[in-house]
């Protein structure tokens, strides 16, 4: 019985230290998620779903967020996704989703672990399946 208790204590200490160290590491090195929103005229029909979609993405732990559209940067890296700033954005103009690959315009694209592209364009093809995730609004 004594041997079991010793092994049990070692096991509990090992697991606890692993969890604590993982937590501390993830706090210092959070995932960077960039959310790119299509604000073309064609998004008018789905614009009501955009804020809820963005809020659903923002429920992840150990993450910092960046929010931008094809026309402007809404906010750079922040621990909270400031989706309320989308209230001032209105869909207008032509669709140009290739801008979401332009790292000279948005340096956050290079820094991001993942880039979520929110659009309703069924014909848009993702170039890098590992980094870019397409969210199609119906």
Language model features: what each stretch is:
Residues 3-23:
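Hydrophobic membrane-insertion alpha-helices, especially the h-region
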Residues 20-22, 52-54, 100-104:
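A generic local structural motif
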Residues 24, 130-138:
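A charged, solvent-exposed segment within the mature domains of Sec-exported extracytoplasmic proteins
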Residues 26-49, 120:
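MIDAS-like acidic motif and immediate structural context at the N-terminus
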Residues 28-30, 58-62, 106-112:
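Flexible, charged surface loops at secondary-structure boundaries
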Residues 48-49, 128-130:
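Short amphipathic alpha-helical segments
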Residues 49-67:
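An active-site-proximal "capping" alpha-helix that borders the catalytic cofactor pocket
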Residues 68-118, 122-125, 136-138:
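Von Willebrand factor
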């Amino acid at each position: 019985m004594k041997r079991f208790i010793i092994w049990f204590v070692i096991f509990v200490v090992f697991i606890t230290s692993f969890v604590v160290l993982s937590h501390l590491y993830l706090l210092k090195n959070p995932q960077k998620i960039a959310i790119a929103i299509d604000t073309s005229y064609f998004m008018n029909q789905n614009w009501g779903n955009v804020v809820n979609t963005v809020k659903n993405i923002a429920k992840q732990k150990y993450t910092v967020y960046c929010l931008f559209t094809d026309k402007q940067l809404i906010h750079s890296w922040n621990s909270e996704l400031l989706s309320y700033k989308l209230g001032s954005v209105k869909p207008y103009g032509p669709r140009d989703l290739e801008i979401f690959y332009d790292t000279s315009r948005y340096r956050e694209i290079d820094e991001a672990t993942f880039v979520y592209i929110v659009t309703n364009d069924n014909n848009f093809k993702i170039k890098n399946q590992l980094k870019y995730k397409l969210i199609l609004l119906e």
